[in-house]
Amino acid sequence: MSLSIDVTSLPSISSNIFKNESSSTTSTLSGKSIGRNEQYVSSDIEAFNKYMLSKSPEDIGPSDSASNDPLTSFSIRSNAVKTNADAGVSMDSSTQSRPSSNVGCDQMDFSLTKGINVSASLDSCVSISTNHKKEKSKKDKSRKHYPRIEADSDSEDYVLDDSDSDDGKCKNCKYKKKYFALRMRMKQVAMQLIEDL
C-alpha cells in the first residue's frame, strides 16, 4: 500500500533550525517501480530554545503547540516545509523517469511500512419474547364508579343547575338538594330584611 501526498507552497521555517538527513529508496509493488525520496527532519534543541525565547509571551498561542510537549510540537511543525509538486510518488513511473528539482525545495513523501491487522468477533444472543399479557393499568384499577345522584326540588320554580354554583364545585353531590334549599331560604330572609328596612 502506498500513500502519496503532494504539498505545495507551504511556508518554510528558517532552514538553520533543522538538521536534514536524506535517504532515497526504491521499492517494488505489483511489478511497478516506486521511487521514494524521504526527508527526515529532526529538531535542534538549541535552535528550538532560541526560537521560543525570541517570541514574546503574547505571541505564543494555540497554533504554537500541536502537542503538550513543546519539543514535540516544534518537531511536528518542522514537517511543514516548502515542497515541490514533483515529490509525489507515481505508480507508473520510476525514479529515473520522474523529473526532480533539488534547488530551493525539500521533497516529502510518506510510506506505510507497518500493516495493521484487526480481528474482532462479537458473539451475542438476543432473545425477544412476543408473549404479552394484557395488564390493566393502575389508572383503571384506581378509578371507582360512583352512582349518579339526582336531586329534585318540591317547588316548581326551583331549578337545579350548576350555572350559578361555586364554579361547578357542587356537581351531583349528596348535599346538593340541601345546599340549594338553604340558599333559597337565605335569599328569602335577605329580601325580607331589605323590605323591612
UniProtKB/Swiss-Prot annotation:
Residue ranges with Acidic residues bias: 152-165
Region (Disordered): 16-36, 130-167
GO molecular function: ATP hydrolysis activity; magnesium ion binding; nucleotide binding; RNA binding
Keyword match Metal-binding: yes
Stretches with biased composition (Basic residues): 131-146
GO term, biological process aspect, one: viral genome replication
Known cofactor(s): Mg(2+)
Residues recorded with modification Phosphoserine: S67, S153, S155, S163, S165
Keywords: Glycoprotein, Host cytoplasm, Magnesium, Metal-binding, Nucleotide-binding, Phosphoprotein, RNA-binding
InterPro entries: Rotavirus_A/C_NSP5
Description of post-translational modifications: O-glycosylated.
Subcellular location, record wording: Host cytoplasm
Residues the entry annotates as binding Mg(2+): D92
Gene Ontology CC annotations of this record: host cell cytoplasm
Record carries keyword Metal-binding: yes
Pfam families: Rota_NS26
Transmembrane segments: none
Function: Plays an essential role in the viral genome replication. Participates, together with NSP2, in the formation of viral factories (viroplasms), which are large inclusions in the host cytoplasm where replication intermediates are assembled and viral RNA replication takes place. Orchestrates the recruitment of viroplasmic proteins such as capsid proteins to these factories. Participates in the selective exclusion of host proteins from stress granules (SG) and P bodies (PB). Also participates in the sequestration of these remodeled organelles in viral factories.
Protein family (similarity comment): Belongs to the rotavirus NSP5 family.
Subunit-structure text: Homodimer. Interacts with VP1. Interacts with VP2. Interacts with NSP2; this interaction leads to up-regulation of NSP5 hyperphosphorylation and formation of virus factories. Interacts with NSP6. Participates in the selective exclusion of host proteins from stress granules (SG) and P bodies (PB). Also participates in the sequestration of these remodeled organelles in viral factories.
The protein's name: Non-structural protein 5
